[in-house]
Swiss-Prot record:
Belongs to the TRAFAC class myosin-kinesin ATPase superfamily. Myosin family. This is Unconventional myosin-Ia. ATP binds at residues 101-108. Residues 571-593 are annotated as: Actin-binding. It comes from Bos taurus.
């Protein structure tokens, strides 16, 4: 049973029954499998990463959720964003949206969805749209430079981001401020197996054109850079080439100039090239170990790229200057130290470039002073991380998550308590785990782990990670949330998973083991002064600005604050900022470790739900009353349960709610009436209300159906009755009208006859007998004479092509007019024929024969109509040698041309000469005129030809023919229309019989060995050229393709 009809599982976990960890996870799983990834815990949104694009984020959904309140539609991130925005705009309360969860749980995507929704609903206008576009386009820039592929997430944020979006009093965006936290700069020089460096390096190499790569002195192959993992250069579902173009467009929209974009890419290229600087062992003259650069070309290219003296850079990488108030001492660095210096420089350049980018974006989107602003903060910060090898970065990341969990617990309880106080409802204390003891363990000013780390970094003498661990073991040996090998041994606990250089903290999310190796180094975060000064001397404006401490005039011997101290200060500031705003929570959950769509790991989600405190959050929400709703909304939903409030209620909302609940006889212990809301203690009571509402809806539906059916039947009856009356009246009227018209026509006819009879009777005495016939004949002859004289004057031209003919003036002349037209056309044709010479007559007869044979049957016929039939296409009359081919044959040569003979055995072709006389068809070889075949026309049984534009045809012989011992002939002619026309006419003249011509795409040719089936098909070109290609298909089939 659910709160809303048709929902999947329970949409609000506050209403879950029974309330247990397993049922909570099962409900999330059920909804996830139905692609319902959002679930509420009161006003907290739980989001399970679907690892796929869902069709629930288009403009239709934006419009839907902006018009409804939080609980009126299905759970959605737009509902939470809309609630936060409306609270900011209408109630003037600053908001913050806290997005938390593991790496890969979808926090970055959630923050982008929140920003896109707010941008879509917060007003329009040229200036407003410009501000919204700049805020949205900051995401691609920060993702390119701050996100990377990790083992668990292909687009993991490796920095923390908090954005304050500022609005005016109308809710229109004015600008914003971005704050970043602890970029994971160690990733610049080293990544775990299966991980990538920051996206920008791969986008630059994949998306930059050849000219830009040449200017940056880079090559496209990622395998040529020491700082990039070659095995993971590509990521499924990520197009680095396209993303680079998106990055360039985003930087332009934000306000970066072309020169600034070029300088940013040059600094990124400098980091890549620094990784390829290879250092080797060298020794000074006194035998002291030193270092040098194997190939100076790389350093030289770096110098050319950023305007840096390569000699000074090499000196800064391979030596160090120790400076006190009185003297300077230069010491050489061995290879390990030089490599450390090179990597430290690369990390610092990239980290400072990232900070510069954030500041540059802030300059573009910042709001002018003097305006009153409302603020909505969106926090997208690294999720809780538990890796196989956890170092300093994981320690501070998890510390930040501890602080956020503390904020969540305190502000959730605070909000719940304040709502009860506002409504006058007694508050019931809820037991929950307070992680303040863990936060205090890490951040205490005198005895916290961070304080001990700073103290160890500043302590004179030999300082190492092991001395730091020893101090922690001494201070926290009895702390309930701290463990190490030493403390376990003291308590006689034996854990083989705990290393000697490790300590463990029992976080709210679970136990995490940290390896102290490099803690001191990463906390110091020192960069040798020689390297800062070398970078400051570069002629590159951006690179120079990143190292202000390199300026000798601003040189200071004061030690900079440690990384841990800076991060602790930033987190403290962030917490103060969050406490000053109204919180909105999005708890992101990763459903599986392999980023697979549709796969839900019950165990993994259980662990996340446990450390996110989802069950405790539900219990807090249900501490006093599981469900609460404004009187107006509650009455609107349930007023149908009382006859007093249904269908109309004119009283107050609270009074109406009391009427409804009073008639249901519900226990007073289950209800509490606040000032503006009704509170219900247990979900069972709410489910009872929903069940009663469902039953009542069925009753009302039945009533509505009954009423509707009755109304429809009455309406139909009334309409039919009205229609019958209208039809009857029209029918009767029409019948009367027809009867009246018939009676009137009859009366007029009788009157006409009577008047005629009377007129004839009265005037008969004045006329002679037969006068009418004489007059009518005279009139008719006059009309005929007029028609013929008019026709004589309007006769068309004597051209047989002119089809015009004047129409008859009267209908009874139509027959005569058509006959005259026919006679005139015959006369014109005779006159035309009398003018023709015998040769022209013969030509036209051949064309007429061709038309009868091929018109509408062969595609090449229309092209042959305007072309005269020449007959001789080989120059027979001018070549005596060719005339000998005729032999003893008498009479003229009707047709002479070169044809192609198709070999029946291998489908190969060869040229032949074909002669047509009045009695024979002669086929002979051009090279051997003696080898000829003479076919009498009376031996021909028929001709087969295709309907395409080709010249292929077959001469079929009669069965009694003695000619062609090898069989019938398959030939190709360029003048097939003319040739076959002449053969048919010659055969008719010689045998007085018509030669059959078959137009078909498949015919049989008989040979000595048997028959061969010829199949003609049209090629992909549509047969426009008429070219043929032959292909043998077995021994009995030949396939011909017309190109």
């Amino acid at each position: 049973m659910t709160l809303l009809e048709g929902s999947v599982g329970v949409e609000d976990l506050v209403l879950l029954e029974p309330l247990e960890q397993e049922s909570l996870i099962r409900n999330l799983q059920l909804r996830y499998e139905k692609k319902e990834i959002y679930t509420y815990i009161g006003n907290v949104l739980v989001s399970v990463n679907p690892y796929q694009q869902l069709p629930i984020y288009d403009l239709e959904f934006v419009a839907k959720y902006r018009d409804y309140t939080f609980y009126e539609l299905k759970p959605h991130i737009y509902a939470l964003a809309n609630m936060a925005y409306q609270s900011l705009r209408d109630r003037d309360r600053d908001q913050c949206i806290l997005i938390t969860g593991e790496s890969g749980a979808g926090k970055t995507e959630a923050s982008k969805l929140v920003m896109s929704y707010v941008a879509a609903v917060c007003g329009k206008g040229e200036q407003v749209n410009s501000v919204k576009e700049q805020l949205l386009q900051s995401n691609p820039v920060l993702e390119a430079f701050g996100n990377a592929k990790t083992i668990r997430n292909n687009n993991s944020s490796r920095f923390g981001k908090y954005m304050d979006i500022e609005f005016d009093f109308k809710g229109f965006p004015l600008g914003g401020v971005i704050t970043n936290y602890l970029l994971e700069k160690s990733r610049v020089v080293k990544q775990l197996e299966g991980e990538r460096n920051f996206h920008i390096f791969y986008q630059l190499l994949a998306g930059a054109d050849a000219q830009l790569l040449k200017a940056l002195k880079l090559e496209r192959d990622t395998g040529g850079y020491a700082y990039l993992n070659p095995d993971t250069s590509r990521v499924d579902g990520m197009d680095d080439d396209a993303n680079f173009k998106v990055l360039q467009s985003a930087m332009t929209v934000i306000g970066f100039s072309d020169e600034e974009i070029r300088q940013v890419l040059e600094v990124a290229a400098l980091v890549l090239k620094l990784g390829n600087v290879e250092l080797i062992n060298e020794f000074q003259a006194n035998g002291v170990p030193a270092s040098g650069i194997r190939d100076g070309r790389g350093v030289q290219e770096i110098g050319e790229l950023v305007g840096l003296n390569s000699v000074e850079l090499e000196r800064a990488l391979c030596s160090r200057t120790m400076e006190t108030a009185k003297e300077k001492v230069v010491t050489t660095l061995n290879v390990i130290q030089a490599q450390y210096a090179r990597d430290a420089l690369a990390k610092n350049i990239y980290s400072r470039l990232f900070n510069w980018l954030v500041n540059r974006i802030n300059e573009s989107i910042k709001v002018g002073t003097g305006e009153k602003r409302k603020v909505m903060g969106v926090l997208d910060i690294y999720g809780f991380e538990i890796l196989e090898d956890n170092s300093f970065e994981q320690f501070v990341i998890n510390y930040c998550n501890e602080k956020l969990q503390q904020v969540f617990i305190e502000m959730t309880l605070k909000e719940e308590q304040e709502e009860y106080k506002r409504e006058g409802i007694p508050w019931v204390k809820v037991e929950y785990f307070d992680n303040g003891i863990i936060c205090n363990l890490i951040e205490h000013n005198q005895r916290g782990i961070l304080a001990m780390l700073d103290e160890e970094c500043l302590r004179p003498g030999v300082v190492s990670d092991s001395t730091f661990l020893a101090k922690l073991n001494q201070l926290f040996s009895k702390h309930s949330h701290y463990e190490s090998k030493v403390t376990q041994n003291a308590q006689r606990q034996y854990d083989h998973s705990m290393g000697l250089s490790c300590f463990r903290i029992c976080h709210y999310a679970g136990k995490v083991t940290y390896n102290v190796n490099s803690f001191i180094d990463k906390n110091n975060d020192l960069l040798f002064r020689d390297l800062s000064q070398a970078m400051w001397k570069a002629r590159h404006p951006l690179l120079r600005s990143l190292f202000p401490e390199g300026d000798p005039k601003q040189a200071s011997l004061k030690r900079p604050p440690t990384a841990g101290a800076q991060f602790k200060s930033s987190v403290t500031t962030l917490m103060k900022n969050l406490y000053s705003k109204n919180p909105n929570y999005i708890r992101c959950i990763k459903p599986n470790e392999h980023q697979q769509r549709g796969h839900f790991s019950f165990e993994l989600v259980s662990v996340q739900a446990q450390y996110l405190g989802l069950l405790e959050n539900v219990r807090v929400r249900r501490a006093g009353y599981a469900y609460r709703q404004a009187y107006g909304s509650f009455l609107e939903r349930y007023r149908l349960l009382s006859r007093s409030t249904w269908p109309r209620w004119n009283g107050g909302d609270q009074e109406g709610v009391e009427k409804v609940l009073g008639e249901l006889s519900m226990s007073s212990e289950e209800l509490a009436f606040g000032k503006t809301k009704i509170f219900i203690r247990s979900p069972k009571t709410l489910f009872y209300l929903e069940e009663q509402r469902r039953l009542r809806l069925q009753q009302l539906a039945t009533l509505i159906q009954k009423t509707y059916r009755g109304w429809r039947c009455r309406t139909h009856y009334q309409l039919m009755r009205k229609s019958q009356i209208v039809i009857s009246s029209w029918f009767r009227g029409n019948m009367q009208k027809k009867h009246y018209r018939k009676m009137k026509a009859s009366a007029l006819l009788i009157q006409a006859f009577v008047r005629g009879w009377k007129a004839r009777k009265n005037y008969r005495k004045y006329f002679r007998s037969g006068a009418a016939l004489i007059l009518s004949n005279f009139i008719y002859k006059s009309m005929v004479q007029k028609f013929l004289l008019g026709l004589k004057n309007d006769l068309p031209s004597p051209s047989i092509l002119d089809k015009k003919w004047p129409s008859a003036p009267y209908k009874y002349f139509n027959t005569a007019n058509h006959e005259l037209q026919r006679l005139f056309h015959q006369w014109k044709c005779k006159k035309f024929r009398d003018q023709l010479s015998p040769k022209q007559v013969e030509v036209l007869r051949e064309k007429l024969c061709a038309s009868e044979l091929f018109k509408g049957k062969k595609a090449s016929y229309p092209q042959s109509v305007p072309i005269p039939f020449h007959g001789d296409y080989i120059g027979l009359q001018r070549n005596p040698k060719l005339q000998k081919l005729k032999g003893g044959e008498e009479g003229p040569i009707l047709m002479a041309e070169t044809v192609v003979k198709v070999n029946r055995g291998n489908a190969k072709t060869s040229s032949r000469i074909l002669l047509l006389t009045k009695g024979h068809v002669i086929i002979t070889d051009m090279k051997n005129p003696q080898a000829k075949t003479v076919i009498p026309l009376n031996s021909l049984a028929g001709v087969s030809v295709t309907s395409f534009k080709d010249g292929l045809f077959s001469l079929h012989l009669s069965e009694i023919s003695s000619v062609g011992s090898k069989g019938e002939f398959l030939l190709v002619s360029e003048h097939v229309i003319e040739l076959l026309t002449k053969i048919c006419r010659a055969t008719l003249d010689a045998t007085q019989m018509q030669l059959p011509v078959t137009v078909t795409e498949e015919f049989s040719v008989k040979f000595k060995e048997g028959s061969l089936t010829v199949k003609v098909i049209q090629g992909p070109g549509g047969g426009g050229t008429g070219k043929l290609s032959f292909k043998k298909k077995g021994s009995r089939c030949l396939e011909v393709t017309v190109q």
